[in-house]
Amino acid sequence: VRGRVAGAVTWTAGRLWLAVLLVWLWERVTTQVGEAYFPPPSEIVATGRELWFSGPADRFFLTEEAVEDFGPSLLNLFAGWLLTGLAGVALGVALGLSRTFARYVEPIVHFGRAIPPPTLISVFLSVFALGTSMQVATIVFGVIWPVVLNTMDGVRTVDGLHLDSAEVFGVRGLRRLRMIVLPAAAPKIIAGLRISIGLALILMVLSEMFGSKHGIGAHLVDSQRDFEPAAMWAGIVFVGVLGYLLNAAFTLVERRGPHRHHLARAAT
């Protein structure tokens, strides 16, 4: 245990000093150059604090701008991602279990995956009009494919011996799916969900740039139009930090996946 803790501390410290060095260099260079479009990090942080985190203590220091910028974005992000997870895992399981179903549907999946989601924003605008439905639909269409394909691959790689053993002991249908198939496919499902959350973050921002009045994407457009580079960079930094934290959380879960997979195999 001590070795793991020491290794984690060393790994974190190794990354931390590099991040500090890069921020310091950014501060020094931008201060010396004085380019308006590239403000120093100190100005970006101060602007972000003033915009979003200078509210009253009873609201956790969040301002009205924070609620308008973060609330719709996080709602769109997690609504789209949750719908993607449910639909993607269900479709992936069906494709993995049924070769006949996969023969007809898998080509459609690969065709849909090849379409760049931004090219369909105008279509979604026509179908759903401007608003949350259009933004969530853009996210779902753009990020469902890695979930479907990873789930399908995970289901297809389940050890046949375990399935045969389950058949002998009368474990069939949904019970077999819950006890054997899903636990064995869990590492690849989690990997697909981790990839999809990063894509969902990108499409969240992109969809909000098209006529939306609220959300971090709308904030970026407004800041650029009003020539407020520090506010624009504050939004970019927020998106980057959010993406890093989400990826780190899924990486942690993914690292525990093989251990759980091993336990699931041992239990069968």
Predicted segment positions?
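Short cytoplasmic-facing helical segments at TM-TM junctions of multi-pass membrane proteins
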Residues: 147-192
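Periplasmic/extracellular loop-to-transmembrane helix junction in inner-membrane transport proteins
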Residues: 32-82
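C-terminal transmembrane helix and the adjacent membrane-cytosol boundary/short C-terminal tail
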Residues: 156, 234-268
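Alpha-helical membrane-protein architecture signal
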Residues: 45, 63, 67, 71, ...
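Transmembrane-helix boundary motif in ABC transporter permease subunits
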Residues: 79-109
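N-terminal signal-anchor/first transmembrane alpha helix
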Residues: 1-29
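Generic hydrophobic transmembrane alpha-helix motif, especially the helices
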Residues: 110-146, 153-154
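Transmembrane alpha-helices
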Residues: 137, 141, 174-207, 233-234, ...
